[in-house]
Amino acid sequence: DPRAALLFKWRHGKALRATGTELHCNTRDALQDLPALLSANPKACVFFDNVLGQLRFQNPATDWQQVERRLKQLKVQLKGREWGSLHDRMSGPCTRPIALDSALPVRHPDWHDQYWLTQLDAQSPWLDHLTQDVFPTGVSVQNFAWNFSANYRHWLQAGWVRP
């Protein structure tokens, strides 16, 4: 998003300056240029904020296997580096309206996917954002809901990988 850097600086610039934090924003396609960015910044950690779940929309619907391969390749590219992501896992309509003041469901680690979707009041069909294999095995992943609108929820995943 070409406006992201401007909006981030507008919203957080004062706090960044107060702490002496230096912010560098790359406005190119960071995923396409990831190998070069990683090489140029060997000590930098990487955070994907609402990026990885959107990749399926940059390809034709028939190229879902290509999207999955690209997402799995990230684990290889980022091996040995600290990185994290917050992304959509699935999204879709709900069987009943979501009250504005309702608590956001958080997934219990023992729940299987279908039970979790039941807790979200998911009404088929839900869109699979193809991010089920983003994180390496063994990484603690938090699953929680985000109420996009009164009748539509997103299942979000967040995780942080340490080398």
Where are these regions (language model features)?
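Charged, low-complexity C-terminal accessory regions
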Residues: 91-163
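Short, glycine/charged-enriched secondary-structure capping and boundary segments
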Residues: 11-14, 60-62, 99-100
